[in-house]
């Protein structure tokens, strides 16, 4: 069988690949030969120098090292390792007792390298210097010759001498700053800070003349009241606070900012009376509702005439100043009618005399038919008043009992009977 003939292109590709592989193999052989022929004189010299340096260092404590090498690290006593760990910081040097012992040269080198960083890394607290040190700017890597260490001068008791010295220092610094180059970043800020720190504080003298300090104070009410009574509604001095409450019709109006008592001699008994004083025209009922202290006084009230409707006293009248408390912006009349509402018995007393006389008492009814009892019940419910109440007998029939001496006193209400 004849082999199929290859095209000339394929033959050229195969030949090129074979040549490439042959070249790679030849290059690898040359590299191997070159590496094997490299001279080893430098390695021998390095080893001899290390041996000599190690022998010189080990002459001092050779006996101690031989003992340590003779004992394996596993059999070493534990207290030796703990002592070494306490002497040497664990962060800087950690000894591993389980590692096999190294050669003498390696130990000598490690020990010499450990002693150097210990001496360099030991932190020492700097002593307190007399003058504060100002570091240069971050952009400058060296200390400029014109930069100085600024320090705060001691305070003297004499402010004038201190001020003159500060002025001289400022002038010298200003002259020195002109000569110094403009690229320094510390001079301008430091001069300003030193001037602000050392400048004396002028307390009460302005150009040698004493100056009165005006402090904002709140004027008292009696002072303002006396000024109003003497000078009218005009302010007396320029030091008083400016007020606009005198424009209002009354100083006790709720819109005023500062309420002042226009009567300095304020009576002690200034609380307002109960609103029940103003709800009836009868003097007898007024005397019944008064407190024991008010009963001793005459019942005539000139400030508030009696009325049937409880209302807040007028604030625009000057007479209402008697009813104001000594606390500003507070009027007891605003809370009396809300907290102490009038009792419902007050209007009932007025109509009791008219209705009790017109409705006669009904005698007790004997239980009868259902039609009679229903008629009696409807008549009783529709015709009873505040002074007449329903009573139930043993059979559940409502009975109307009129005002009499046996159950309820004449002219009294249910509330009075219950309270008694």
From Swiss-Prot:
Keywords: Acetylation, Cytoplasm, Nucleus, Phosphoprotein. The keyword Cytoplasm applies. Residues 2-70 are annotated as: Interaction with SWI6. Its main location: cytoplasm. Residues 30-187, 273-319 are annotated as: Disordered. The modification N-acetylserine is found at residue 2. Residues 43-55, 106-122 have a biased composition (Basic and acidic residues). The keyword Glycoprotein does not apply. Residues 277-319 have a biased composition (Polar residues). The modification Phosphothreonine is found at residues 99, 419. It comes from the Eukaryota. One of its GO terms (molecular function) is transcription coactivator activity. One of its GO terms (cellular component) is nucleus. Interacts with the ANK repeats of SWI6. The interaction with SWI6 is required for function. Interacts with SIN3. Present with 319 molecules/cell in log phase SD medium. Involved in the regulation and timing of MBF-dependent transcription in late G1 of the cell cycle. This is Protein STB1.
